[in-house]
C-alpha cells in the first residue's frame, strides 16, 4: 500500500512541476509578446493630419486594454450604463493641440488662403 501511495505522490509532484513550468513559460511568452513594441505606421493624412503610429497587439488583447481592464469610450449623445473603469482616455483627432490651435482661423501661410 505504501508503494502505491509513494508512486502516486511522485506522479503528483511531476505533474505539478510540469504544469508550473508550462504556466511560467506562458506568462513569459505573454509578457515578451505584449511588451514588444512593433509599430505599424498608418498613413491617413486627411483624418489624422499626419502619420499615426499604433502598436500591433495580439488578438487576445485587442479592445480590452491590459488584461481585462474595461476600455469604454464616451461619445456625445451616448448614455453609458457601464462606468468608466480603467485608466484609459480617448482622444478624438480634432482635440489635438494642433487642431485646436488652427480650428477657427485659416492658415495664413498656406497658399490657398494667401491673398
Swiss-Prot record:
Membrane-traversing stretches: 9-29
InterPro entries for the chain: HRCT1 (IPR031506)
Cellular component, GO, one term: membrane
Subcellular location: Membrane
Region (Disordered): 86-115
Basic residues bias locations: 87-115
Membrane topology, record value: Single-pass membrane protein
Protein keywords: Membrane, Transmembrane, Transmembrane helix
Keyword Ligase attached: no
Predominant cellular place of this UniProt entry's protein: membrane
PANTHER family recorded: HISTIDINE-RICH CARBOXYL TERMINUS PROTEIN 1, PTHR23009
Protein name (record): Histidine-rich carboxyl terminus protein 1
Species whose genome carries this gene: Homo sapiens (Human)
